[in-house]
A protein has these predicted regions:
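Charged low-complexity intrinsically disordered patches
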Residues: 1-10, 109-168
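Short recognition helix of helix-turn-helix/winged-helix DNA-binding domains
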Residues: 1-59, 63, 98, 110, ...
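Terminal low-complexity, poorly structured segments
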Residues: 27, 57, 74, 119-122
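A generic structural signal for solvent-exposed, polar alpha-helical segments
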Residues: 21, 27, 34, 45, ...
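Append "and, occasionally, other polyanion-binding protein interfaces
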Residues: 17, 58, 67-70, 74-79, ...
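Bulky hydrophobic/aromatic packing residues
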Residues: 28, 63-65, 88, 131-139
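A general marker of short, structured functional hotspots
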Residues: 11, 24, 35, 42, ...
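Winged helix-turn-helix DNA-binding recognition segment
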Residues: 45-109
């Protein structure tokens, strides 16, 4: 029988992964059921190189959430507890189209905004940085009042030792 030359015969299936150390945190254990569902759906959207380009809209997630209210309440809970962060706020683009807000998972590093395909006509972009912030380990999001405070908070958090996590 000839030896394999490193090619796979079958493609492996994609999966939605949340690291075990994230699930073991007290913040994850305190999440509502709809927030856990939304977090799994965001992990499903995350393909490894698009963190910061994840969307939460009812038109995309309507088969999972029956109402806007439940979905946006789950989004707010994930933000307050530090599992997601805003990468860009929604609104109008340069050519007048509606754009959805973009989100990033805080346990993974944020990918380059320039390379993300949904942002060709984006008016606002919050540079949240590339390093993972892992706010959920500390018990919640710091909730700065403006972009300048957000950047300062991010720089301070990345320097702290408790932001770095140990991968299993």
């Amino acid at each position: 029988m000839p030896r394999s030359k490193g090619r796979r015969k079958e493609k492996t299936a994609n999966f939605a992964g949340i690291p075990r150390w994230v699930i073991d945190t007290p913040a994850y254990k305190s999440l509502d059921g709809s927030a856990i569902k939304l977090l799994v759906l965001l992990a499903y959207q995350y393909k490894g190189k698009n963190n910061g380009d994840l969307t939460i809209t009812h038109s995309v997630l309507k088969e999972y959430f029956k109402s806007n209210t439940t979905m946006y309440r789950a989004r707010d809970e994930l933000y307050k507890k530090g599992f997601i962060d805003f990468n860009a706020y929604g609104g109008k683009s340069f050519d007048g189209r509606k754009m959805s807000s973009l989100y990033a998972l805080t346990w993974a590093s944020v990918d380059d905004f320039i390379k993300l395909k949904k942002n060709c006509y984006r008016l606002t972009h919050l540079a949240i940085g590339k390093e993972p912030t892992v706010y959920f380990v500390k018990g919640g999001h710091p909730n700065p009042k403006n972009t300048k405070q957000k950047k300062a908070q991010y720089k301070k958090d990345v320097k702290k030792a408790n932001v770095k996590h140990e991968k299993n």
